[in-house]
């Protein structure tokens, strides 16, 4: 009898440990809490690409293909005045030079001459070389004042899904990779219209950017490797849906006055008090580590382009000292610590290089 009780006790403890490991693993994959994925039909629509957009049978995921005929993409069915936009994404593998996979918000189809935009753009590479990516922000058509930063990743984004997210509120913008905030833009009064203020839609696309994406256009898309497949799943859209608040004939109207009377205060309050709107001390440390190890260009340190940094730039002396006046790294485009980190990873593959350790 005693042996039976002891056996049950051991089994119960083992089950608790297994459950804890599963919960921790889930958090590492999802990265952020309070994310409510939608079905494709709930809030998304086919943008372009004919048969190159393939939805899963459960309508929870979608594949975007690029072949020699066309790329593909989807768009949110509504426009949002501020929001949290998130997806688990897996990128194509092997040779991907010239390819761009983009997850972004924009209103360029509506406000053609003064559009707003928030970008996460993945830039393909030669086989054996890693994907790179950039974030960017435009407000009120300020495309001549790009605010891009470029980075490497601490994992292979073609091997498994990782969550990429954009938070846009009235006061700040945060770009996330899993549970790590990689960039925060705090709104400053001096930014004026350069801070995105008009309703935007969510977009996801894959397309041929051979003219610039890899080594400045030196290497283009090789369609002998096609089709190139990017996968999106567990897509989340949280925000103030302004399309539902407009009369039918005014949907997608390019008159900003049609949107000004829509009250988004409750939605904004929800966004600004949610977990993904607050950077904890551990997450701030993870963001600092990420930027130290993986950021290789920042417009804030590009003094040739901007003799005076744009008003939202926070100049970190230790960070600035690693960059040339072109905004690029001094050390031949490579962080000196990265080589040591690679050696450590080879010794201990289970230890993440960057983690918020929530």
Residue ranges and their predicted role:
Residues 2-358:
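GH16 jelly-roll
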């Amino acid at each position: 009898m005693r042996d039976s009780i002891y056996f049950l006790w051991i089994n119960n403890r083992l089950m608790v440990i297994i459950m804890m490991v599963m919960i921790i693993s889930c958090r590492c994959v999802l990265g952020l809490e309070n994310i409510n994925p939608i079905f494709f039909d709930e809030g998304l629509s086919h943008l372009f690409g004919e048969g190159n957009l393939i939805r899963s049978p459960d309508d929870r995921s979608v594949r975007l293909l690029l072949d020699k005929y066309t790329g593909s993409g989807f768009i949110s069915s509504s426009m949002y005045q501020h929001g949290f936009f998130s997806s688990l994404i897996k990128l194509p593998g092997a040779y991907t030079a010239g390819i761009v996979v983009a997850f972004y918000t924009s209103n360029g189809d509506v406000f053609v001459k003064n559009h707003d935009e928030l970008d996460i753009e993945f830039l393909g590479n030669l086989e054996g070389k890693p994907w790179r990516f950039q974030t960017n922000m435009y407000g009120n058509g300020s495309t001549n004042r790009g605010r891009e930063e470029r980075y490497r990743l601490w994992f292979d984004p073609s091997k498994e899904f990782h969550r990429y997210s954009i938070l846009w509120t009235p006061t700040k913008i945060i770009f996330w990779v899993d549970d790590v905030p990689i960039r925060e833009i705090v709104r400053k009064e001096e930014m004026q219209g350069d801070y995105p203020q008009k309703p935007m839609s969510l977009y996801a696309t894959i397309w041929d950017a051979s003219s610039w994406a890899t080594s400045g256009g030196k290497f283009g898309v090789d369609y002998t490797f096609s089709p190139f497949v990017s996968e999106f799943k567990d897509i989340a859209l949280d925000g103030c849906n302004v399309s539902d608040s407009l009369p039918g004939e005014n949907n997608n109207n390019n008159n900003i006055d049609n949107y000004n009377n829509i009250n988004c205060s409750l939605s904004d309050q929800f966004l600004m008090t949610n977990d993904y709107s607050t950077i904890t001390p551990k997450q701030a440390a993870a963001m600092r580590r990420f930027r130290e190890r993986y950021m290789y260009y920042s417009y804030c340190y590009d003094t040739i382009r901007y003799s005076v940094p744009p008003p939202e730039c926070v100049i970190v002396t230790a960070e600035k000292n690693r960059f040339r006046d072109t905004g690029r790294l001094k050390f031949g485009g490579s962080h000196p610590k990265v080589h040591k980190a690679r050696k450590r990873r080879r010794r201990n593959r289970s230890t993440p290089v960057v983690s918020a350790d929530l």
